C-alpha cells in the first residue's frame, strides 16, 4: 500500500514539475534564438560599414527594366550569403560565386546549413534542407506539338530568419510598383536592381543605408523569424532554399495590413509572405540598430506595418 502511495506522489510531482521544466527549456531556446538574430544583426551592420549600405535581399529587376538588367532575374545567391564573411564564415563564403546563378553553385555548398540561421525551438541543422525536386514544364515544339519535360529544381539549406522587405503598401497585384521588384521594397533588406561597375563587377543599384531609414533604426525591423507551419517545413514556397535568390519567401518577408504575425498553430498555415515563430505568443526580431525584441503576436497589423516600413513617418508603439 505504501508503495502505491509513493508511486502516486511521484506521479503528481512529475506532473507538477514537467510543465515548469518545459517552460524553462523553451525560455532558453527563445533566448538562444534572440542571440542568433543579434548575430545576424551585427553581421549586417558590419556589412553596412564595409559597403556603406545594407545587403540587397537579392538582385531583381524592375518590371520595365532594360534587357541588360532583366538578365539578372533573382537567381543569384541571397543576402544571407553576402553576410557570411561577417559571421566568421569566410571559408564558406569563398565557395560561392555571387555573379553566377544559384543553380550553378556546388551541391555541397547550397546544402550547407548553419546553426546561426535556424531557430532552436523549430529544429536543428539536421532538419534544415529542402530536397531537390522535379517539375513538369509544358513546352511546344517547332512542329506545334505540345508536351511536358521534367526539369530538376535545385534544393538547398533552409533557415528560420528573413530580412525585413517592408510592407505591402507598394502593392502585390502584378503591377510594376509591386514590392518584390527591384528597389520597390519599403523595408531594409529589399530586392535591388543589379548593375555592373566600369570593371564589369556585379553590384546593386538600390542601396539602403542608415540615412534611408528616417523613421529611426530603433523603430525599424532588420530581420525576424519567418512563418512556416510544421507541415510546410523544408518545402517550397513556404520554406525553400534560403540561399536561392529566386525563393524570396525563404529569406525575406513583409508585415503589416494583410500580413499579420502568426504562431505555430495559427489557421493561416499557407501564408508565405509574413513573419511568425514557434515560440508561445511572440516572434523574435532584430532591429536596424542591432537591438532584439520579442514582439507579441497580437500586435495589430497597422503597428506591424510601421515596424516594417522604414519611411512611413510613424513611430510604432511596440508591445
Where are these regions (language model features)?
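N-terminal single-pass transmembrane signal-anchor helix
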Residues: 1-29, 39
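Surface-exposed loop/linker segments characteristic of extracytoplasmic
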Residues: 12, 27-319
Amino acid at each position: 500500500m505504501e508503495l502505491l502511495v509513493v508511486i502516486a506522489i511521484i506521479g503528481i510531482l512529475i506532473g507538477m514539475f514537467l510543465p515548469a521544466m518545459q517552460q524553462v527549456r523553451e525560455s532558453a531556446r527563445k533566448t538562444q534564438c534572440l542571440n542568433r538574430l543579434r548575430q545576424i544583426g551585427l553581421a549586417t551592420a558590419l556589412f553596412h560599414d564595409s559597403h556603406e549600405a545594407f545587403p540587397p535581399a537579392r538582385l531583381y529587376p524592375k518590371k520595365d527594366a532594360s534587357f541588360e538588367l532583366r538578365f539578372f532575374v533573382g537567381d543569384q545567391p541571397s543576402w544571407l550569403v553576402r553576410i557570411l564573411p561577417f559571421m566568421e564564415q569566410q571559408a564558406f563564403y569563398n565557395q560561392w560565386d555571387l555573379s553566377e546563378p544559384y543553380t550553378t553553385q556546388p551541391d555541397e555548398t547550397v546544402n550547407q546549413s548553419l546553426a546561426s540561421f535556424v531557430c532552436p525551438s523549430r529544429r536543428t541543422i539536421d532538419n534544415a534542407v529542402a530536397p531537390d525536386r522535379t517539375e513538369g514544364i509544358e513546352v511546344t515544339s517547332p512542329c506545334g506539338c505540345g508536351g511536358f519535360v521534367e526539369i530538376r529544381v535545385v534544393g538547398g539549406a533552409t533557415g528560420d530568419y528573413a530580412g525585413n522587405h517592408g510592407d505591402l503598401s507598394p502593392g502585390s497585384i502584378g503591377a510594376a510598383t509591386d514590392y518584390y521588384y527591384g528597389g520597390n521594397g519599403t523595408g531594409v533588406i529589399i530586392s535591388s536592381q543589379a548593375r555592373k561597375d566600369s570593371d564589369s563587377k556585379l553590384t546593386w543599384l538600390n542601396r539602403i543605408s542608415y540615412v534611408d531609414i528616417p523613421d529611426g533604426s530603433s523603430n525599424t525591423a532588420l530581420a525576424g523569424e519567418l512563418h512556416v507551419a510544421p507541415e510546410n517545413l523544408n518545402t517550397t514556397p513556404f520554406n525553400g532554399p534560403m540561399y536561392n535568390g529566386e525563393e524570396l519567401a525563404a529569406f525575406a518577408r513583409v508585415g503589416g495590413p494583410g500580413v499579420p504575425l502568426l504562431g505555430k498553430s495559427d489557421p493561416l498555415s499557407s501564408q508565405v509572405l509574413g513573419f511568425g515563430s514557434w515560440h508561445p505568443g511572440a516572434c523574435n526580431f532584430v532591429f536596424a540598430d542591432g537591438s532584439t525584441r520579442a514582439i507579441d503576436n497580437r500586435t495589430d497589423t497597422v503597428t506591424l506595418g510601421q515596424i516594417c516600413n522604414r519611411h512611413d513617418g510613424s513611430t510604432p508603439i511596440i508591445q
